[in-house]
Amino acid sequence: MPVQSMSRIISYWAARQADRVAIDHEGRAITWGEFEERTNRLARAYSELGVQPDDFVTIALPNGIEFFEACFAVWKLGATPQPISAKLPKSERDQIIDLGKPSLVVGAETGAFEQIVSVPQGFVPGEHLSAEPLPELTAASLKAMTSGGSTGRPKLIVSAQPAAWDTDLPYLEIPQQGAMLVPGPLYHNGPFVWAMIALFRGCTVAITTRFDAEQTLTTLERLKINIVYMVPTMMRRIWALPEDVRTGYDLSSLQTLWHLAAPCPAWLKECFIEWLGAEVIWELYAGTEGQGTTMIRGDEWLTHKGSVGRPVEACEIKIVGEAGETLPSGEVG
């Protein structure tokens, strides 16, 4: 199937699985058919508020169905979502707003900015707005994430990838029309990317308001999750549960557990490999800027402990010494 604009992906899956759950937030669910209609109406509301193609739209919403609806409504207008934490202090939020100069801020009180339109959490589009599909538009940039970086001041990391995706493209071991759990904050790049690609692939995506170790296991069992995104801190908290609690859930549907974003202690990784199986555990090393990516599966890691894997896609890895010279394999640089 050809690459599809983000403005068309929900329509594509809604036509094929309208009654299947698209997003589950701690038991509250929305189907693909509902997701399509609600984002069409919301996109028209954002358009009435002034959003144009290739604008940035700041999304300051907590984890929830509303977060996804806002992002896809923005994509349906050919604009670019810019997620930020809903809990940012006003001073930090205003710095990011000044940096990105969005045409709309979603999740801020009405009138919060002198020259930028804003709508609060819980904003509902008018009943007069149509739920019919909109014209196809493709934003020049898929996403614009924020980071404090090493300077302590916010910076905007604008993706060079257009807002389009091949829904048949195998990626990150995410099964087409599977079920994925993302228990991390969606304004972070990792959870955002994993959750969105899962939706692009037609998966049911489960999210939680915040991470809770046993709730994660409950959700894995309840929704027969195939793939889950984690960071080592989450893994450590799950391992700290009483053994009878940790092993008391049916996780037989789980095919892939990704961990990334921080170094994982070898002992913890070994525990998860022994518990879930080496071929289930995957590690990824990358950055929001997208300069390159490495991946390694658990069975490969067992023979190369400490490795973060081989480069993938067009990435090349080079280790250099203090003078900038290329070092041979096995040397520390």
Where are these regions (language model features)?
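Conserved AMP-binding/adenylate-forming core of the ANL superfamily
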Residues: 2, 11, 19-64, 68, ...
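Structural core segment of the AMP-binding/adenylate-forming
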Residues: 44, 48-49, 69-72, 76-137
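Gly/Ser/Thr-rich phosphate-binding loop
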Residues: 145, 200, 226-229, 243-304, ...
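Conserved AMP-binding/adenylation subdomain of ANL enzymes
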Residues: 165-179, 187-227, 241
